[in-house]
């Protein structure tokens, strides 16, 4: 399923991902983090077991920390940064949907596994 949209996916390694997982995928998943610069704002994407709201990576005012690990979707707007969690496609927790996040036209959308919008995170 994911290999079909491999050119549209940005993934970072989770705390349970291994090299054997990478062998069946046609897009990279083994990076510890990814840094994107979009519209003058930095998005720091990481799994969240190392860098998270309690242990921040180097961020500037207005930057976005995007992490998973808890498998619970979230958007927390702090004074200096925004923290977002897309939840989990495979193992959602706290009665949340199987879901993922997309960035489209400067907005983050949380979608369920069928592709339906469940929420908008940031404008």
What are these regions (language model features)?
Residues 1-38:
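Core catalytic region of metal-dependent phosphoesterases/phosphodiesterases
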Residues 10-12, 30, 44, 66, ...:
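Structural detector of well-ordered beta-strand residues that form the stable sheet scaffold
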Residues 2, 36, 45-47, 87:
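Generic structural signal for conserved hydrophobic packing positions in ordered secondary structure
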Residues 42, 49-119:
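Conserved beta-sheet core of the metallophosphoesterase superfamily
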């Amino acid at each position: 399923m994911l290999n079909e949209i491999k050119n549209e996916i940005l993934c970072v390694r989770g705390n349970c991902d291994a090299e054997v997982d990478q062998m069946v995928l046609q897009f990279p998943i083994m990076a510890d983090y990814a840094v994107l610069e979009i519209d003058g704002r930095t998005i720091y994407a990481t799994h969240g077991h190392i860098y998270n709201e309690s242990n921040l990576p180097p961020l500037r005012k207005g930057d976005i920390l995007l992490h998973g690990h808890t498998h619970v979707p979230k958007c927390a707007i702090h004074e200096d940064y925004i923290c977002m969690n897309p939840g989990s496609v495979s193992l959602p927790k706290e009665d949340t949907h199987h879901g993922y996040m997309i960035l489209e036209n400067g907005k983050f959308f949380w979608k369920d596994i069928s592709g339906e919008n469940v929420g908008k995170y940031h404008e």
